[in-house]
Amino acid sequence: MSLLAVERIRAGYNEEVDILQGVSLRVEQGQIVAIIGPNGAGKSTLLKAIFGILHPKEGRVVFDGEDITGLPPETVVRKGMSYVPQVRNVFPSLTVQENLEMGAFIRRDGFFERIEEIYRMFPDLREKRHQRVGRLSGGQRQMVAMGRALMLDPKLLLLDEPSAGLAPAMVEMVFEKIREINRRGVAVLIVEQNAKEALKFSDHGYVLAMGRNALDGPGQELLRNEEVAKLYLGG
């Protein structure tokens, strides 16, 4: 049984237009799965539909064997899924420590053990735990956002464009942290414009175009695909 099964989802931001037009995908236990495609393909919309921010008009979202289609985000979180949006993913006026504490709002059991694990994973955050997040670099803020999502001890982490706007050195650090998160047993579904780097460490990838599935396969296989390389990998 797949950890996540998205089946023929149709969704949009109004009744007239469907951004997603029957998209399907799967994430198995322990996998990293990448979603790539051009701007406007529906990648971020798909994450919102999975997490319950958007209510699908058709199709199903099944998570850990349970149909969660249309459930609100606060319910989806309790079932073991966390989501890091591309923007507004931290509280800039709060400290690093306070941001992480906000992530434990529904799970107080094991709080101190989890926050220590986050600090071991992101040692820079321990050093800056009393600083306001708004004063941190973009890469450090992304670490805070991921750390806060991990405070819920999720089975699946959804990441929307985690490398957006970051310097190249910070991009590599963020990607390495994603790999580390996955090695600790958390499955990851990532939307990423840096398609080449995302596919390098992904077990499977999906290419979306105009709100539909265009292609999918193992990450390394998609890297070698001539059509994918021409359209999305700059080669």
List PLM regions with ranges.
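Glycine-rich phosphate-binding loops of nucleotide-dependent enzymes
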Residues: 2-235
